[in-house]
Amino acid sequence: MDHRLLEIVACPVCKGKLTYDKDNQELICKLDRLAYPIKEGIPVLLEPEARTMSMDEGR
């Protein structure tokens, strides 16, 4: 994931900052507890595609 891309993309729900989870290939919104998948190197920033994170994740 290009770190320059992380500087300009935002959560489509709250417009907050996203962080990159290399192990799971996801972009994480800690505010909304949503994990957006990265498929074939392309972030899928669609709310219906996002996974709701458990309370234990992302700490």
Curated annotation (Swiss-Prot):
It holds the Pfam family Trm112p. SUPFAM superfamilies: Trm112p-like. Signal peptide: none annotated. GO terms for cellular component: cytosol. Belongs to the UPF0434 family. This is UPF0434 protein VIBHAR_01537.
